[in-house]
Amino acid sequence: MAKTNDAIKIIDKMNHNDLEIQEMVAIASINAEVAQLIYETRIKAGLTQKELAGLIGTKQPVIARLEDADYEGHSLSMLQKIASALNKRVEIHLTSIE
């Protein structure tokens, strides 16, 4: 079996039969991905957190929380507001578990 240095794959192998841990890891992974996506898109648009907040009618600390991978309060409606302000659209896909 080939070695891997992918942390998610290693954790998955260690907890293969523990569905609760698998779910926690999946949620943490999604939160991190959403936070990174918001951050990268804002930076590419050349906006500060405060400027993006102004575009969607909120305050800078809200954007800071959304860009924090540990934040668990992401919502699709807020993501849609951010996408619209940055001239993007939200796409959601479900894929098979490998």
Language model segments and positions:
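N-terminal flexible/basic segments that precede or flank functional cores
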Residues: M1-E33
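Short basic helix-loop element that most often maps to the first helix and adjoining turn
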Residues: M1-T4, Q36-L55
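Short, conserved glycine- and acidic-residue-centered signature motifs
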Residues: N31, E72-S75
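Helix-turn-helix DNA-binding elements, focusing on the entry/boundary residues of the two helices
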Residues: I38, Q49, Q60, L76-L79
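Short glycine/serine/threonine/alanine-rich loop segments
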Residues: L47, T58, K88
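Recognition helix of helix-turn-helix/homeodomain-like DNA-binding domains
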Residues: I56-E72
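DNA major-groove recognition helix of helix-turn-helix/homeodomain DNA-binding modules
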Residues: L76-I92
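Short, charged recognition helix plus adjacent turn
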Residues: L94-E98
